[in-house]
């Protein structure tokens, strides 16, 4: 059986006790992907050649995971930008989650509304699905999603060639976007944290199988 390999970027944690940086990933991601019959492959942040590494892995999809703010750890920003460059050149689908969606937005010349007292941290809320194709794929035009982000993407922040497909019902900030041409999609919620909800596995299927491109 052919492995369905998904690469996952890693967050950086600075461990003061040992004076070192470590790449980390929530066990939720590994459990979630394996439950859906995907093979998770980790992409570290201190590679000498990101493109060679990804090329050797023969990945079928890539997830830019959450955690860390953009600019907090430059090595992660650089790694994920190189991942996006490689994915675009090789038509590899990409899903950006929370920080990952923000990284996608800045990659395409968008901006982030930082340090907002948004009330999004730890507070589930509804989102409106704006795109008819995605309404059809989800089977609903509204979803309840988790929320763990302070930084926001507002309508004026959205990057070039990105289409908005989901808005927060409470403040109309952007909760989902995708590229008009490339198989790249981002969500501000965390699919790995509410695995029992159907739309969490649906977003993985939509990105991996390029269902809107």
How should each PLM-predicted stretch be described?
Residues 174:
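His/Met- and acidic-residue-enriched segments that coordinate or traffic transition-metal cofactors
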Residues 147-148:
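DNA-recognition element of transcription regulators
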Residues 185-189:
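Active-site-proximal beta-strand elements of phosphoester/diester hydrolases
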Residues 1-99, 106-113, 118-133, 137-138, ...:
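N-terminal beta1-alpha1 cap of cysteine-dependent amidohydrolase-like domains
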